[in-house]
Curated annotation (Swiss-Prot):
Renumbered residue ranges of the record's region Disordered: 92-126
PANTHER family per the UniProt record, alphabetical: 30S RIBOSOMAL PROTEIN S13/40S RIBOSOMAL PROTEIN S18 (PTHR10871), SMALL RIBOSOMAL SUBUNIT PROTEIN US13M (PTHR10871:SF1)
Gene symbol of the encoding locus: rpsM
UniProt superkingdom: Bacteria
Entry-linked InterPro entries: Rbsml_uS13_C, Ribosomal_uS13, Ribosomal_uS13-like_H2TH, Ribosomal_uS13_bac-type, Ribosomal_uS13_CS
Entry's Gene Ontology BP terms: translation
Complex and partners: Part of the 30S ribosomal subunit. Forms a loose heterodimer with protein S19. Forms two bridges to the 50S subunit in the 70S ribosome.
Entry protein name: Small ribosomal subunit protein uS13
UniProt record similarity statement: Belongs to the universal ribosomal protein uS13 family.
Length: 126
């Protein structure tokens, strides 16, 4: 099993798809990496030679921020927005949509589940 950037790539998938299991690498970036290293994209991960794995690992580590470094960078960017008090920072802090989406309805993913509110009790019928 090939281990790149701390992630075990699935053995039976094509290299192109296997690389997308690394946080920060999507399909187009995986294709760029494969083109730069000269690895055949149709090769299965289990069929990669040690030289291929080393080439892929070197390309990713030298030219891309992935996994923990990328997560840390994103959290620092959000923290910076919160600290300087921008509108986007306030939205992050309040747990609301940041990019101008409506909140009167929808936005359930960002706001979380509905909070139930106790309704008025019905008066006993006569």
């Amino acid at each position: 099993m090939a281990r790149i950037a701390g992630v075990d790539l699935p053995r039976d998938k094509r290299v192109e798809i296997g690389l997308t299991y690394i946080y920060g690498i999507g399909l187009s970036r995986a294709q760029e990496i494969i083109a730069a290293t000269g690895v055949n994209p149709d090769t299965r991960v289990k069929d990669l030679s040690d030289a291929d794995v080393t080439a892929l690992r070197g390309e990713i580590e030298s030219n891309y921020q992935v996994e923990g470094d990328l997560r840390r960078l994103e959290s620092l960017n959000i923290k910076r927005l919160v600290d300087i008090g921008t509108y986007r920072g306030r939205r992050h802090r309040m747990g609301l949509p940041v990019r101008g989406q409506r909140t009167r309805t929808n936005a359930r993913t960002r706001r979380g589940r509905r909070q139930t509110v106790a309704g008025k009790k019905k008066a006993p019928g006569k």
